[in-house]
From Swiss-Prot:
Binding of substrate, residues: 45, 282
Top-level division of the source organism's lineage: Archaea
Function: Catalyzes the ATP-dependent phosphorylation of thiamine-monophosphate (TMP) to form thiamine-pyrophosphate (TPP), the active form of vitamin B1.
UniProt xrefs under PANTHER family: THIAMINE-MONOPHOSPHATE KINASE
Reactions this protein catalyses: thiamine phosphate + ATP = thiamine diphosphate + ADP
UniProt name for this protein: Thiamine-monophosphate kinase
Residues given in the record as Mg(2+) 4 binding sites: 22, 36, 66
Gene Ontology process terms (BP): thiamine biosynthetic process; thiamine diphosphate biosynthetic process
HAMAP family: TMP_kinase (MF_02128)
Entry keywords, A to Z: ATP-binding, Kinase, Magnesium, Metal-binding, Nucleotide-binding, Thiamine biosynthesis, Transferase
First and last residue of the signal peptide: none
Listed InterPro entries: PurM-like_C_sf, PurM-like_N, PurM-like_N_sf, ThiL-like
Binding of Mg(2+) 1, residues: 37-38, 111
Length: 286
């Protein structure tokens, strides 16, 4: 089983409406708060060679990326850190603070404990002051499928290409882009940290639609081998870019550079270049 299978155990308890997005939502009279939490382990999430500062940065960035995917502004981060050795703490919290400072969030402490493996749980709160969050369930047939940035960089760094090592270790959440997409009228959005393919399937499942994308339109690093980079972009994960869906009419409202990779279709099939796209991505398995 993988983490998406296990989510089906949680849905009946919490309710599908609260378990279907990058963040949980608390509606306010004048906007909304969004919250997300992420658990990272050294063996599975922090590659050998990462500095403590980069570990702290990444631990915060993954949560801020979830907040960005709702079109929200990050407010506050708390970290629960299970330390394997106390000497690592100072560098980790400096990296965490740097990421918070970069994206306008407050690092507000958290919890400390001893642990045999370095484990960090990051919890974040974001706010939308002027509207509603963008969820995963709003994609409509005819919508244009858009992504920010270039994809595949993180896995290229993980597999030995030093040109992309920083992309892997110091992800840059797309907070501004998420807000712009929300204000432009995006119908659905999520981050693609688990890979583009599985993210398309996640949106399709919540929106009850199909999708048609073109491999030639997926933005890849020009300096990398095309096929290797395409595989990394589709299935590798680690790219904290945004995937969103917007009508052709509302595309003119966007003030950020994005790439159009396809369209939403009727039915439930997802295809790339006319062939069914494998449902694969970065998953935790039990």
């Amino acid at each position: 089983m993988d983490d998406r299978d296990l989510l089906e155990i949680i849905r009946p308890v919490c309710g599908s409406d609260t378990c279907s997005d990058d963040c949980a939502i608390l509606t306010l009279p004048c906007g909304a708060l969004v919250t997300s939490t992420d658990m990272l382990h050294e063996r599975s999430d922090f590659p050998a060679g990462m500095t403590g500062w980069q570990i702290g940065w990444m631990s915060v960035a993954v949560t801020i990326s979830d907040i960005a995917a709702m079109g929200a502004e990050p407010l506050q981060i708390v970290l629960a850190i299970g330390l394997d050795t106390e000497e690592r703490l100072a560098e980790i919290v400096l990296g965490a603070q740097a990421c918070c400072d970069t994206y306008g969030a407050v690092y507000a402490g958290g919890d400390l404990d001893a642990h045999s493996e370095l484990t960090i749980v990051s919890t974040g709160v974001g706010i939308i002051r002027d509207g509603e969050p963008v969820r995963r369930g709003g994609a409509k047939p005819g919508d244009i499928i858009c992504v920010t940035g270039t994809l595949g960089r993180a896995i290229l760094g993980l597999t030995g290409d030093s040109r992309f090592w920083k992309d892997l270790c110091e992800p840059q959440p797309r907070v501004r882009e998420g807000t712009v997409a929300r204000l432009a009228g995006a119908h659905a959005m999520m981050d693609i940290s688990d890979g583009l393919a599985i993210s398309l399937y996640d949106i399709a499942a919540e929106s009850h639609v199909g999708m048609e994308i073109s491999s030639g339109r997926i933005p890849l690093p020009p300096e990398a081998d095309v096929q290797v980079a395409l595989e990394a972009a589709l299935y590798g994960g680690g790219d904290f870019e945004l995937l969103f869906f917007i009508s052709e009419e509302k595309m003119k409202n966007l003030t950020i550079p994005v790439t159009q990779i396809g369209r939403v279709s009727e039915g439930l099939k997802i295809t790339m270049d006319g062939m069914e796209l494998p449902k694969k991505g970065y998953l935790h398995h039990w």
